[in-house]
């Protein structure tokens, strides 16, 4: 399995027979290196979207058309894009599982908000979510934008994820300390990767509080477009 952080909440995950782009934000992303665009997108099979905010969806439709990769996410938003943009989508809901080749993706709860920006203000975009991605005999939890929640214990009971990708930059999501609390209280992760930080001055610039809060856990803090092999 290969996991590449594309900056902010965006990831490329190569798992089993799939190359998944998670919330790919390239256009306007201040930390994404434009000269690595081709490497980030090469061979993508599906685009997974956790919620509707622009820093997670800005490129989704255009990339789907460019790459021929279906967009996977909450039913409401997928239905809207299928109808208005003519893109192929896979819509499902929390608790549901879809098979993407040899990879099982289960949608789980998140605590955030979800909307698309319009000329008339925010437009409802379905509920916010996270994903459990299972392949190669392992499970990755992608939290999406969220705070700590007691649901996480249920997620661990049902899915036993070994790898946690946690939004932890604060202000819009849980911060590093809260993410550490979530990981050590509700999960049994072997590896944790923080995200949704260092993008703007408003967000956390260091993952050190997460590292300090998870002694004995392998906390990885890759640079943008650095690939971790697990």
UniProtKB/Swiss-Prot annotation:
Keywords, alphabetical: Hydrolase
GO MF term list: hydrolase activity
Domain of life: Bacteria
Classification via InterPro entries: Metallo-B-lactamas (IPR001279), RibonucZ/Hydroxyglut_hydro (IPR036866), UPF0173 (IPR022877), UPF0173_UPF0282_UlaG_hydrolase (IPR050114)
Family: Belongs to the UPF0173 family.
HAMAP family assigned: UPF0173 (MF_00457)
Protein name in UniProt: UPF0173 metal-dependent hydrolase Dshi_2788
Lineage: Bacteria, Pseudomonadati, Pseudomonadota, Alphaproteobacteria, Rhodobacterales
């Amino acid at each position: 399995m290969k996991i590449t952080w594309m900056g902010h909440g965006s990831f490329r995950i190569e798992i089993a027979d799939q190359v998944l782009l998670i919330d790919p934000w390239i256009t306007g992303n201040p930390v994404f290196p434009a000269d690595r665009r081709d490497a980030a997108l090469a061979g993508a099979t599906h685009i997974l979207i956790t919620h509707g905010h622009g820093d997670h969806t800005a490129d989704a439709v255009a990339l789907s058309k460019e790459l021929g990769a279906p967009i996977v996410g909450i039913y409401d938003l997928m239905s809207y894009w299928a109808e208005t943009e003519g893109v192929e989508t896979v819509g499902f809901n929390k608790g549901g599982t879809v098979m993407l080749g040899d990879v099982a993706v289960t949608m789980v709860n998140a605590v955030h908000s979800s909307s698309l920006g319009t000329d008339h203000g925010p437009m409802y975009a379905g509920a916010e979510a996270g994903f459990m991605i299972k392949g190669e005999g392992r499970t990755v939890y992608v939290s999406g934008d969220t705070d700590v929640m007691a649901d996480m214990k249920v997620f661990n009971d049902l899915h036993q994820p070994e790898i946690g990708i946690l939004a932890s930059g604060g202000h819009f999501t849980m911060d590093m300390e809260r993410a550490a609390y979530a990981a050590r209280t509700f999960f049994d992760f072997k590896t944790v990767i923080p995200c949704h930080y260092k993008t703007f001055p408003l967000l956390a610039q260091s993952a050190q509080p997460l590292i300090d809060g998870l002694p004995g856990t392998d906390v990885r803090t890759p640079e943008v477009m650095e690939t971790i092999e697990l």
